[in-house]
Amino acid sequence: MIKQRTLKQSIKVTGVGLHSGNKVTLTLRPAMPNTGVIYCRTDMNPPVTFPANANAVRDTMLCTCLINEDGVRISTVEHLNAALAGLGIDNIIIEVDAPEIPIMDGSASPFIYLLLDAGIEEQNVAKKFIRVKKPIRIEDGDKWAEFKPYDGFRLDFTIDFEHPAIGKDVRNYVMDFSAQAFVQQISRARTFGFMKDIEYLQSQGLALGGSLDNAIVLDDYRILNEDGLRFKDELVRHKMLDAIGDLYMCGYNIIGDFKAYKSGHGLNNKLLRALLENQEAWELVSFEDKEEIPQGYVSPAQVFI
């Protein structure tokens, strides 16, 4: 039986909020089987919980933001959510003493280290997957994203920025998902932004924690980070990271083919909602025998950084 996974122990880290610029403490705790992914704001009295759910994503302007019925929000969840998807963590309580998850270095890599440091424990309950049965496509102008059936989880992402530092040879990335592939190829890819946009956001009291330490920053001609890029195609890899985090808002690893052109948090979420709303387009499955499971999901807890 392919089993559900949680953490062996709780673990804590402190970072900076991307938009507030304030110190944020993040605590990750083990959870019982079938709990799912639960975000919790402990700075509220009483604490407010946000189960990871496609319908709870109600703001995708600058990041993926969960908002409850009372208008309380928790922002910038996508990088941590991607790390959970990458390592196949089904059940976890995520506590944060602020309205946003700390940005860390702008990638999912610090969260991978944190989760592996806490340890991953299998639970004696079958892990469930969402298997795509029929094609689903969402379009917005020239942007689009789609799911198709596939025996595994394949991602194909294309960006299209007209910028001297983003050549046409680094605008597409394709990956067959596995924990190993995610950790080595995707998790270290950092978020990025353009200097003129960051300056405007900061003038509006946003992105106050944004810096060259937690983002790739571009002016009109070049990349401003002294150390350059971690991968020549780091920007499109980060967009794939975002998509993995956004799609894991359903709470299950996906078995299917995901392809996107110029997609972002909003379109990723619309695609996920469209899939879940069409009951004939997907099914919830579990596997008794490792021989039956797509290869990429066989041993998500065993990775080498």
UniProtKB/Swiss-Prot annotation:
Keywords annotated in UniProt: Hydrolase, Lipid A biosynthesis, Lipid biosynthesis, Lipid metabolism, Metal-binding, Zinc
Binding residue positions for Zn(2+): 79, 238, 242
E.C. code: 3.5.1.108
Gene3D superfamilies, sorted: lpxc deacetylase, domain 1, lpxc deacetylase, domain 2
HAMAP family: LpxC (MF_00388)
Its biological purpose: Catalyzes the hydrolysis of UDP-3-O-myristoyl-N-acetylglucosamine to form UDP-3-O-myristoylglucosamine and acetate, the committed step in lipid A biosynthesis.
Protein name per Swiss-Prot or TrEMBL: UDP-3-O-acyl-N-acetylglucosamine deacetylase
Source organism per UniProt: Histophilus somni (strain 2336)
Gene designation: lpxC
